[in-house]
Amino acid sequence: MLVHQVNTKLCSAKQFTHLAKVVTPALSYQASSVYSANLPRLAASPRLFSTTSSAQLRDFFPVKETEHIRQTPPTWPHHGLTEKEMVDVVPGHRKPRTLGDKFAWSLVRISRWGMDKVSGLSSEQQQINKGSPTTSIVAAKPLTEAQWLSRFIFLESIAAVPGMVAGMLRHLHSLRRLKRDNGWIETLLEEAYNERMHLLTFLKMCEPGWLMKILIIGAQGVYFNAMFVAYLISPKICHRFVGYLEEEAVHTYTRSIEELERGDLPKWSDPKFQVPEIAVSYWGMPEGHRTMRDLLLYIRADEANHRGVHHTLGNLNQVEDPNPFVSDYKGDKPRPVAASRPEGFEREEVIGKEVIGKEVIEKDVIGKEVLGKQVSV
């Protein structure tokens, strides 16, 4: 009978030495690769509203590679801004004049208070100044970079809702009336697109956790439906509400810029810090002007523009008046600059008085067109 002798040793000393020489470099290479890949993300500070581990961060919306398409440019390219236009933006406030204005302003203040509470800001970090009708841009204690990003992402996720709702309803209104909308739809949809680009930019810097995602879904559902019903009831109050909301956005970004300039946000002040490529492409940020401060200046200028647009639209006839920000004026008069007027333009400034001279085309009995006299409408 054959008896097989079993070697109980795993390997001899010579074999073990040879095996170690082969395995050790491979293991060390994998370990170093994993460590180096995760090192920058591990360095990121904890994020409010985020349950995602820093080590699990990834490109939140990677570009899909296709065989033929190289890239998809923005549908609405940014119109561009000069440094002077961005620096000249100042916080402002339109004092409530009507009952609707007061209602809209109260809703914004309540929303701001609720956002501060949900964000977990301490009393020293909150901006609300009870002794002033506007929000203070200075607080006793600065926010961290993580707190700012969490706040930006949540706010921008719902900031794009009003423009889309208003644009959609005005589009349907135009179809029902079989009439032109006179430029309102394009401006409102472009605003929604612009706010979404703000969100996508910040998402390249911070991935929200599951709690933030749930809050965004809930807030969007409530906000969209509430805005939908409210705009059907009173478009004027809705535009005033969004105007006040954009005032708060200008205050928020102004405070973040000032904290950055004071050195309270060292990670964003680092000369090595670069803004996401999506921001460089969308705003056309030139070389040497791609810091976090530059990015915040661009976004604040956008919010200032929305502030002026909505306060102005809230002053107009919601059915008949054209959009003054896309219209061509008589006598080569320049278009109004929304960002330059925090409280918006009055109707008389951009449309004119209630009685306007208008040339009427009439036809005589033989069908020839005759230029009629000016009449009042």
Swiss-Prot record:
Its cofactor is Fe cation. It is found in: Mitochondrion inner membrane. The keyword Mitochondrion applies. GO terms for molecular function: alternative oxidase activity; metal ion binding. Its main location: mitochondrion. GO terms for cellular component: mitochondrial inner membrane. Its EC number is 1.-.-.-. Keywords: Electron transport, Iron, Membrane, Metal-binding, Mitochondrion, Mitochondrion inner membrane, Oxidoreductase, Respiratory chain, Transit peptide, Transmembrane, Transmembrane helix, Transport. This is Alternative oxidase, mitochondrial.
